[in-house]
Amino acid sequence: MMTKLVINPVAFQLGSLSVKWYGIIMAVAIVLATWMAISEGKKRQIISDDFVDLLLWAVPLGYVGARIYYVIFEWGYYSKHPNQIIAIWNGGIAIYGGLIAGLIVLLIFCHKRDLPPFLMLDIITPGVMAAQILGRWGNFVNQEAHGGPTTLHFLQSLHLPEFVIQQMKIGGTYYQPTFLYESFFNLIGLIIILSLRHRKHVFKQGEVFMSYLLWYSVVRFFVEGMRTDSLYIFGIIRVSQALSLVLFIATIILWIYRRKVVKPKWYLQGSGLKYPYTRD
């Protein structure tokens, strides 16, 4: 007999303030991503201050972008309830929106700081992947972003820990742990990228980032098809699947173009900046 063990989304109380596991997990994910970027940045002649400053802009604006993206594709609801548009505490963010906003911030930041944008993207990519891997466990605690109904027998056949199986029982029904599928396959992708990143003549600058785009677009396309909370276009097309398909094709085109026309430096050549430099 399985013991009922459901994780409370609230980790602890500070007076009237509820500190939730989701927030704790996201905070740890951000710290991990920053540490990974700073550690790799030193090897590519980028100082830590640039990553910290980028973080201070990219994280809050990334959340804004994630919210705007979600609101746009749920406009039928928010047009009737405009007071809920900023109520992010009630849920409703989309990772693709956060990635798009973060990319825009990074491009502007690199232009202002005279930093190589593709190299910066390469450096932060593994940290972003690690943050996504952890972040999906926040969805797990909240019992959200799951797939369709399934059976206890199926979940047990995956040899999942009991606490995962029980957390996937919502309202008396077991659901597919799509958070786990995405987290697991992103971990595989991260391991592959980390194992290849420091090998000579594997990645040109920008290709660590583009490898992530290719990998994640495939993972998200298939996982999205299982989810029950997808955003839709015209009521029939899943937004994330459509975007994943476009992203996959566009990334291949960009990769070929940069290899044949731009001919960028190898990733291991770094920024070429005199290191350590200082910022006024």
From Swiss-Prot:
It holds the Pfam family LGT. InterPro entries: Lgt. One of its GO terms (molecular function) is phosphatidylglycerol-prolipoprotein diacylglyceryl transferase activity. It is a multi-pass membrane protein. Its EC number is 2.5.1.145. GO terms for cellular component: plasma membrane. Pathway: Protein modification; lipoprotein biosynthesis (diacylglyceryl transfer). A 1,2-diacyl-sn-glycero-3-phospho-(1'-sn-glycerol) binds at R136. Keywords: Cell membrane, Membrane, Transferase, Transmembrane, Transmembrane helix. Belongs to the Lgt family. Catalyzes the transfer of the diacylglyceryl group from phosphatidylglycerol to the sulfhydryl group of the N-terminal cysteine of a prolipoprotein, the first step in the formation of mature lipoproteins. NCBIfam families: lgt. This is Phosphatidylglycerol--prolipoprotein diacylglyceryl transferase. The gene is lgt.
